[in-house]
Curated annotation (Swiss-Prot):
Changing C358A: Normal sensitivity to diphtheria toxin. It comes from Saccharomyces cerevisiae (strain ATCC 204508 / S288c). The gene is DPH2. Present with 3486 molecules/cell in log phase SD medium. One of its GO terms (cellular component) is 2-(3-amino-3-carboxypropyl)histidine synthase complex. GO terms for molecular function: 2-(3-amino-3-carboxypropyl)histidine synthase activity; 4 iron, 4 sulfur cluster binding; metal ion binding. Belongs to the DPH1/DPH2 family. DPH2 subfamily. Required for the first step of diphthamide biosynthesis, a post-translational modification of histidine which occurs in elongation factor 2. DPH1 and DPH2 transfer a 3-amino-3-carboxypropyl (ACP) group from S-adenosyl-L-methionine (SAM) to a histidine residue, the reaction is assisted by a reduction system comprising KTI11/DPH3 and a NADH-dependent reductase, predominantly CBR1. Facilitates the reduction of the catalytic iron-sulfur cluster found in the DPH1 subunit. Pathway: Protein modification; peptidyl-diphthamide biosynthesis. This is 2-(3-amino-3-carboxypropyl)histidine synthase subunit 2.
Length: 534
């Protein structure tokens, strides 16, 4: 008999280890020689506490304020709360710290904020600035320490040719240093074809979005282009010149997340990364698009597709899901929808019936790029799934991750058709180019048009009308690929070894479970109210 699989997430020995020391190292962003006696002043300046206080004073209607920190800055949350509470005594404003984000740290966690009925979210650290659904947002990137002399030294070693076309880029916090780095390279070292990117604060047209940080642009620098929606390119080129990123080498401060890095590698000639936390320059290897092309062919012959939702805050998430479902059904494939926070190998391994995953997440860090083949099933994006399910597989060489662009591509692919064309409705198998053989299970929903099932005569029957096909089990007119896979397993979960001859006609007792969130379940609130009334 097979051993039951492990259904829990693996954890290391230090996952919940108690921290014994009270010393916290902040040299990576406050500098190696910061004075601990001036810690509160440095923290206040780094996190823009004074501008934040001014913002809250201008909006007295905000009484519940949530503070969202990434994992590497959560150690400063208590200090920030202490500084803010000193500015608003008598408990006029309640401050809540989001100690753990459900999805990507660069995105605003609206779901967690709504648990405490937040009226505004203050997001600290690096941010993707993607449009969200409802809540007002205040961004505070911070100004981390940077040794410019060390950066310039590594830059000169990587680019000895003064005429090379180079674009300077960084994440949101470190982008404040780019204008000064540009002046050194352009003015002192005489690099002639240098441009740099800056956060496009003017692109944030949302009424309830505020950026506390300020970005200095020298007077002799012109805007020469726009990179994506949230970055502006500056330089001393003629505005009439057409700035094409394909002509430039990228010099990036800090290491981008894998999805972001993959996108940048498809746009620029080459990518050079200098991370202040790591020694030396990194020039690869980077995630490759060649593996993505293979995954597209896997999706083309997949019978069961899992839609993996790794965000609940980004705008157009629901619209993208609806278009994906429509596309998958049109191609006569089965789909299942999963909402998973921080997906990992162990979580997704529990759903072995899924042939391929299509992930919806933030383009900066919410998309899984399986660079080392850790996951059991491939993971692709909506754009790649749309290319795979087209009538003919075409490879553009692009990597589109924006939801709005993906929706437009899917709508263009569907072309207003709700059903698959008659030429593809035959029972002929489809050739799987990855495994080099024909498969007849790539379109399980096609079987519905050939089945005529009759329900049981007894309306009180507890048995579902089931028929097994080559593609899956049909239960009351619905193809279930997971049910078919379950029937073929030797171990089917807890209770699978129950003696079927001992049938209890009364069935099991149904009990109502608990409701609410961990901060306060329903029965906790009821008990608290009873104690107050006594």
């Amino acid at each position: 008999m097979e051993v039951a699989p492990a259904l829990s997430t693996t954890q290391s020995d230090v996952a919940f280890q108690k921290v014994e020391t009270h010393e916290i190292d902040r040299s990576s962003y406050l500098g190696p020689c910061y004075n601990s006696d001036e810690l509160m002043q440095l923290i206040s300046a780094y996190y823009n506490v004074e501008p934040l206080v001014g913002y809250l004073e201008q909006h007295p209607e905000y009484q519940n304020v949530t503070l969202q920190f990434p994992d590497d800055l959560i150690k400063d949350s208590s200090l920030i709360v202490r500084l803010l509470q000193s500015k608003f005594p008598h408990g006029k404003i309640k401050f809540w710290v989001l100690a753990d984000t459900a999805y990507s740290a660069c995105c605003v966690d609206e779901v967690a904020a709504e648990h405490v009925h937040a009226e505004v979210v203050v997001h600290f650290g690096d941010a993707c600035l993607n449009a969200i659904q409802n809540l007002p947002v205040v961004y505070s990137f911070g100004t981390p320490f940077l040794d410019l002399a060390l950066v310039v030294e590594n830059f000169q070693r990587a680019f000895p040719d003064l005429s090379s076309k180079i674009c300077l880029m960084a994440n949101a916090p470190f982008s404040k240093h780019l204008s000064q780095l540009y002046n050194i390279l352009k003015g002192d070292l005489h690099y002639t074809n240098i441009i740099y990117s800056q956060v496009n604060t003017s692109a944030v047209e949302e009424k309830f979005v505020t950026i506390l940080d300020t970005f200095h642009v020298p007077e002799d620098v012109d805007q020469v282009g726009v990179f994506e929606k949230n970055s502006v390119l500056f330089g001393q080129h003629d505005k009439a010149d057409n700035i094409s990123p394909e002509d430039y080498h990228l010099f990036h401060l800090t290491t981008p997340q894998d999805p972001r890095l993959l996108y940048l590698s498809t746009v620029f000639q080459s990518v050079h990364i200098f991370d202040p936390a790591l020694p030396g320059m990194v020039t690869g290897p980077f995630p490759s698009l060649m593996r993505r092309y293979k995954y597209m062919h896997v999706a083309r012959t997949a019978g069961c597709i899992g839609i993996l939702v790794n965000t609940l805050s980004l705008r157009n998430t629901r619209e993208t899901i609806n278009e994906l479902v429509k596309l998958i059904k049109t191609r006569e494939k089965k789909h299942y929808l999963f909402v998973v926070g921080k997906p990992n190998v162990a979580k997704l391994a529990n759903f072995e019936d899924i042939d391929i995953w299509c992930i919806l997440g933030c383009s900066q860090s919410g998309i899984i790029v399986d660079q080392f083949n850790e996951f059991y099933k491939p993971i692709i994006t909506p754009y790649e799934l749309n290319l795979a399910l087209s009538e003919e597989v075409t490879w553009t060489g692009k990597w589109v991750v924006d939801f709005r662009d993906a929706i437009d591509e899917i709508e263009q692919n569907l072309g207003g058709q709700d059903t698959i064309s008659a030429s593809t409705t035959s029972d002929e198998p489809e050739f799987d180019v990855v495994r080099g053989r024909y498969t007849s299970t790539s379109r399980p929903l096609r079987a519905l048009t050939h089945l005529e099932l009759e329900a049981a005569d007894d309306d009180d029957s507890k048995q579902l009308t089931t028929r097994h096909t080559a593609s899956g089990a049909v239960i009351k007119g619905t193809v279930s690929t997971s049910a078919s896979a379950l029937q073929n397993r030797s171990w089917k979960g807890l209770g699978s070894d129950f003696d079927s001859t001992e049938v209890d006609n009364t069935g099991a007792d149904i009990e109502e479970g608990i409701s609410g969130v961990a901060r306060g379940y329903g029965f906790d609130r009821e008990d608290a109210m009873k104690k107050e009334n006594k």
